[in-house]
Amino acid sequence: MPIYNRIADFHEDLVATRRDIHAHPELGFEEHRTSDLVAQQLESWGIEVHRNIATTGVVGVLKGSGNSKRSIGLRADMDALPMDEEGTPEHRSKNAGKMHACGHDGHTTMLLGAARYLAETKNFDGTVHFIFQPAEEGGGGGRVMVEEGLFDKFECDTVWGMHNSPNLPAGTLAIRPGPLMAAVDMAKITINAQGCHAAQPHMGKDPIAVGVQLYT
């Protein structure tokens, strides 16, 4: 996939940003340093910045060169995972028990790169919302942003996101019609049991047996 010359011009800046974020991973709703970095870069390119959505979420707003009412959202996640990083690269995690093992450092950097390019060229008609989401790793950060009025404040006709895939060659995009890599719903099930003596299991209701049947 060809890379526009202007983006290639600031490739090294993107590498430095990704490595900086990778070296300073933060868990869900704790992405204070990361959100500071994101906001500072967006503001330096003249992008309108809104902060503290779902605690550490950031939204940048950029209007294009025309008067179109159309608007889209471009979204990336910022949080890391609670695990230690092993290895020797200079940009390995400096925060014990925290690591960007799922590539959100790359996602954040890619969205910053898109924001910089669009801010410099404004070669589009409409409005782009750059949505930097906290707490994707099980924290429900996207849901919290919506509950706090994300789309009431920043109306989007469509929202686009992407996820890295190390098993594909560099420069390759994989896509299909409809949703891709969408999250599943979560449910909580309570099994009410009845205790009994170990020698009289037939007098009780064993939650383990019920749980196994439910699972299988």
Language model: regions and residue ranges:
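Histidine/acidic-residue-rich, glycine-tolerant segments that coordinate divalent metal ions
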Residues: 59, 81-83, 87-99, 106, ...
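Acidic/His- and Gly-rich active-site-bordering loop/insert found
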Residues: 1-100, 109, 116-124
